[in-house]
Amino acid sequence: MKKVLILGVNGFIGHHLSKRILETTDWEVFGMDMQTDRLGELANHERMHFFEGDITINKEWVEYHVKKCDVILPLVAIATPATYVKQPLRVFELDFEANLPIVRSAVKYGKHLVFPSTSEVYGMCADEQFDPENSMLSYGPINKPRWIYACSKQLMDRVIWGYGMEGLNFTLFRPFNWIGPGLDSIYTPKEGSSRVVTQFLGHIVRGENISLVDGGAQKRAFTDIDDGIGALMKIIENKDGVASGKIYNIGNPTNNFSVRELAHKMLTLANEFPEYSETAKKVQLVETSSGAYYGNGYQDVQNRVPKIENTMQELGWAPQASMDDALRKIFEAYRGHVGEARKLVEQS
């Protein structure tokens, strides 16, 4: 029976991963987070050992459980672009500095470290598909703090790789725009405070206009969370050590759409649901600049598509969900929350 340590267990990936582990395996989950709102009843499962805490404070608990568990997933990170621009030091301190002692504990106790890199590490790479073995990692100038997240993650990737040269059993995985229920809160009216799909859904729920940054031409390969978790489960299982010392892109190249196309898809799908259809009719698409939306420290990536051949072949995995199916699941999940989210408009 595997013991899996998930730090950030209440986060988007953490709670979906915990659910899959508890439903489909006999593994035990040891989880830490500061809240349980996404976990809900999972926090009370007999194989879920939850501790309410903070990786920057409860360091002894973390080290003890790194020693106790077989597989370590440090999922705690800030991953919202608006924060990269406005609070770059906060991003670096949490995403790199706070996670480094956890990496070193995995080295110390000889554990399998499964670390969340990011599709952002590829930066403004010009390749049609981003290759974890060969693509260049290219960023903008220092006066664009938007790149602090990508730099922090890339530096950690390189540190982990270095420890791998000295014997650390590790796997780096790079999620490409994973989407699904629980990504961010639809209750947040402030633009830029959540990631694009949740932001757009919140606007649709409240009948607000959707801002397309720089026209919404930038494209992303969106990935259903259940597909992403499927690959992650294979990595944690690590049958015959297949994932050891590897870097995997986890994404769906066929779901490559522009942000403008995403907005149109979501508005079309909203008409299938009575809870969303009336407010969706009020929504207009308006164009804005990245400077006005995020601040002058922002730069964008125009295309971000993963090369996933090694992920598919080595893990025996393939993404299944179409873009419409992935979005429809999100609309379904939030149907019961629409009334509460609308109150934000009435109160403002």
Segments the model singles out, each with a brief description of its role:
Residues 4-24:
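N-terminal Rossmann NAD(P)H-binding glycine-rich loop of SDR-like oxidoreductase domains
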Residues 204-348:
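C-terminal substrate-binding subdomain of Rossmann-fold SDR/epimerase-dehydratase oxidoreductases
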Residues 55-94:
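NAD(P)H-binding glycine-rich loop region in Rossmannoid oxidoreductase-like domains
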Residues 143-171, 201-206:
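Active-site Tyr-X1-5-Lys
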Residues 46-57:
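Rossmann-fold cofactor-recognition segment
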Residues 84, 137-144, 170, 176-189, ...:
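A conserved pocket-lining segment of Rossmann-fold NAD(P)-dependent short-chain dehydrogenase/reductase
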Residues 26-36:
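Conserved glycine-rich Rossmann-like NAD(P)H-binding loop of the short-chain dehydrogenase/reductase
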Residues 78-90, 97, 108, 116-149, ...:
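Active-site "gating" loop of Rossmann-like NAD(P)-dependent oxidoreductase/epimerase domains
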